[in-house]
Regions:
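Flexible, low-complexity linker/hinge segments
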Residues: 100-124, 141, 149-151
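Gly/Ser/Thr-rich phosphate-binding loop
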Residues: 229-287, 297-299
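AMP-binding/adenylate-forming core of the ANL superfamily
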Residues: 297-311
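Conserved pre-ATP/AMP-binding loop-to-beta segment of ANL
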Residues: 3, 9-15, 111-129, 160-167
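AMP-binding/adenylate-forming
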Residues: 91-101, 141-157, 162-226, 267
């Protein structure tokens, strides 16, 4: 079951439901709903419309994102949290959300969901940067309707099992893939997620084995194509139920290494900021083909060497 982000804060979830955690702290729904409500109330008193938002902690990022949406702001996500990048992007916005405004509440009691109104899926908007792989990076606006539709499309395929108990990631939520899979999908599904990023495969697999029995890993070829040869993935097979990869081509060797040692092949997602998700595959062998995601139609123009996408 998936809850649209448009109605997420209206959901009557158990205050003790685990939202996110790291090695030293856990955040539950009662605290999360209070944090979002308090920040949204602060932001509603501010006149600025376009807000820059970047934060490396996925819990704080989610609080800021939901609070900005529920205060009627347009969110601009820069491609990273580096100071130079933030300074450049801040000049295109009315204000920057300061992490010091995010003071986690002490109350464990969830805010009455009736305090939140459903978000307008046509006007609520998040702006993201493209990768710049085909030229200079540009801003692409995604309505909440676009985002909820894409989450529902991925949910139809059922890749993340219902019994998943913790989601880990090696990718940033500042980009569309990480935004959807690292932050919004677990919130919509009610799956707890690890709040910090892992820079090294050894660290993420160690935490998976220590903290989870049925984990999901959101990753990319930048990490999966470079797994250390000495890393025994079979040691983690009973703790890791699924691996996702996006952001570039995953090598056949990496796919086979993961599949042979974990007992399941990584799920590759093809897409871009502009198009959203297009297709998926699992490289079980050299004949594995891409399959269109639910609701996506594709057509190839061989003469122009173009792929036309409609969703």
């Amino acid at each position: 079951m998936i809850t649209p982000i448009a109605t997420l804060m209206c959901a009557n979830r158990d205050p003790d439901h685990l939202v996110a955690r790291d090695a030293s702290r856990q955040w539950r729904w009662g605290v999360f709903s209070n944090d979002v409500a308090q920040l949204a109330a602060t932001l509603q008193r501010r006149p600025e419309r376009r807000w820059l938002w970047a934060n490396d902690c996925s819990y704080q990022f989610a609080v800021g994102l939901l609070a900005l949406l529920h205060s009627g702001k347009t969110i601009v996500l820069p491609p990273n949290t580096q100071s130079g990048t933030l300074a450049t992007w801040a000049s295109q916005c009315d204000a920057t959300l300061d992490a010091t405004l995010l003071t986690s509440g002490n109350s464990g009691h969830a805010v009455d969901p009736r305090c939140f109104a459903s978000l307008d899926t046509h006007t609520a908007c998040i702006e993201l940067a493209t990768s710049g792989s085909t030229g200079a990076a540009k801003i692409v606006a995604k309505t909440l309707g676009n985002i909820d539709s894409e989450l529902a499309s991925h949910q139809q395929l059922g890749f993340i099992p219902a019994h998943c108990d913790l989601l880990f990631s090696t990718v940033s939520h500042q980009h569309i893939y990480g935004l959807l899979f690292r932050t919004l999908m677990p919130l919509a599904r009610g799956i707890p997620y690890w709040s910090s990023s892992h820079a090294y495969p050894e660290h993420v697999f160690a935490d998976i084995a220590h903290y989870s029995q049925h984990a999901a890993l959101i990753s990319s070829p930048a990490h999966l194509n470079r797994l250390p040869p000495a890393l025994d993935l079979g040691h983690y097979a009973t703790h890791l139920d699924c691996v996702f990869s996006s952001g570039g081509p995953l090598s056949a060797d990496a796919a086979q290494q993961l599949g042979n040692q974990l007992g399941h092949y990584p799920i590759e997602i093809l897409g871009s900021t502009e198009t959203g998700g297009i297709a998926w595959r699992q490289q079980r062998d050299s004949h594995s083909r891409w399959r269109a995601l639910p609701g996506v139609e594709t057509r190839s123009d061989n003469d122009q060497q173009l792929l036309e996408v409609r969703s």
